[in-house]
Regions:
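Non-catalytic pre-domain segments flanking phosphatase-related domains
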Residues: 1-67, 75-79
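Conserved Lys-Pro-Asp/Glu-containing loop-to-beta segment of HAD-superfamily phosphomonoesterases
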Residues: 178-223
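A short, structured active-site edge motif that brings together acidic residues
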Residues: 135-179
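Well-ordered, non-membrane alpha-helical segments in soluble/globular domains
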Residues: 85-97, 122-142, 184-189, 224-225
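Acidic, Mg2+-coordinating phosphoryl-transfer loop and its flanking beta/alpha structural elements
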Residues: 210-246
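Substrate-recognition element of Asp-dependent hydrolases with the DxDx(T/V) motif
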Residues: 94-134, 152-165
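Short, flexible/disordered intra-domain loops and linkers
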Residues: 78-85, 119-129, 166-180, 217-224
Length: 246
C-alpha cells in the first residue's frame, strides 16, 4: 500500500478553504476518499452572520439535516432517483418551516448525508459520474432556497464510499468508518470549519442545536444511523414528521 498517499488523503482538513474576501460561491472539495464538502468561503460565512449574532456570545446554534427522505425525495416519491435532477422538497411544509426555525433564528444550516455509492478521489473527480451527479443536487437546493428567501448559506457534508483497491490517494478504513453516520466524524469536521470561520473561542451550542433525519430505528426505517449520529454528536434528534409537523 502507498502509505504516503494514505497520509496525504487523511491530512486534508475541512477547514482548509481559501480565504477569498470577495467570493461567496460555495467551494466543492474532495477530502481523500472519505468525504466531499460544499462550503462557503470562510470570510463569506463570517460576513453573513456578522450582524445577525449577539456580539457578546461565542455559541453557535446549528440546524442540521439528513438530505434524502428528510429534506428532499424523488419527484415520483420512489426510493431511488433517476438522476441528479430527479428531486423535490419532501413536502410543502419544508420551506416554510426552514424559514421559521432556521432562517429567522439565524442558525447555521447544515446537511450531513451518507453517500456510500459515490466513490471518488481528487484524481478521479472528472470521470466519476456518481460524483458529478452528487454535486448537482445541493446546488439546486440552495438555488431554490435563495430564490424564495434570498441568499442563505447551506453547508454540505457527504461521507463517500471506499474506492476499489489500487486507487490512490485513499483514506484508511478507519477514516471512512469514522466519517460515516452514525459515527460523528462529519460533525467534528463542521466544528473545525466553524472555528476557522469565526475563531477558536467559538463553540456549537449543543443544547440549542439539533439534527433531523429519517433513519431513526423505527418500524419500517432502514437504519438508525441518523438517530445514532445525533447521539454521538451530543445534540437533540428529531424525525422529519415531528420537526416539519407532518
Amino acid at each position: 500500500e502507498n502509505k504516503d498517499s494514505t497520509k496525504t488523503a487523511e491530512s486534508e482538513d475541512v477547514s482548509d478553504i481559501a480565504e477569498l474576501p470577495t467570493r461567496t460561491t460555495p467551494i466543492w472539495k474532495i477530502h481523500g476518499s472519505h468525504m466531499v464538502t460544499r462550503l462557503p468561503p470562510i470570510n463569506s460565512l463570517k460576513s453573513f452572520y456578522k450582524d445577525k449574532w449577539d456580539p457578546e456570545s461565542t455559541f453557535i446554534r446549528v440546524a442540521a439535516f439528513d438530505m434524502d427522505d428528510t429534506l428532499i425525495c424523488t419527484s415520483l416519491g420512489i426510493k431511488f432517483g433517476r438522476g441528479p435532477h430527479d428531486w423535490k422538497w419532501r413536502n410543502r411544509e419544508v420551506l416554510p418551516v426552514l424559514e421559521k426555525k432556521v432562517f429567522r433564528e439565524n442558525r447555521v444550516l447544515v446537511i450531513f448525508t451518507n453517500q456510500s455509492s459515490v466513490s471518488v478521489t481528487e484524481q478521479r473527480a472528472l470521470v466519476s459520474r456518481l460524483y458529478k451527479n452528487l454535486t448537482v443536487k445541493p446546488g439546486f437546493m440552495a438555488a431554490s432556497l435563495d430564490a424564495q428567501y434570498g441568499h442563505y448559506p447551506m453547508l454540505f457534508f457527504a461521507s463517500t464510499g471506499k474506492p476499489r483497491k489500487g486507487v490512490y490517494p485513499r483514506s484508511s478504513d478507519e477514516t471512512h468508518f469514522s466519517h460515516r453516520k452514525p459515527e460523528s466524524g462529519m460533525w467534528s469536521e463542521l466544528e473545525r470549519y466553524l472555528k476557522r470561520c469565526f475563531g477558536p473561542q467559538y463553540e456549537i451550542d449543543k443544547e440549542q442545536s439539533y439534527f433531523v433525519g429519517d433513519a431513526a430505528g423505527r418500524d419500517g426505517d432502514h437504519l438508525a444511523a441518523d438517530k445514532g449520529f445525533a447521539e454521538n454528536a451530543g445534540v437533540p434528534f428529531y424525525v422529519p414528521e415531528d420537526y416539519f409537523g407532518l
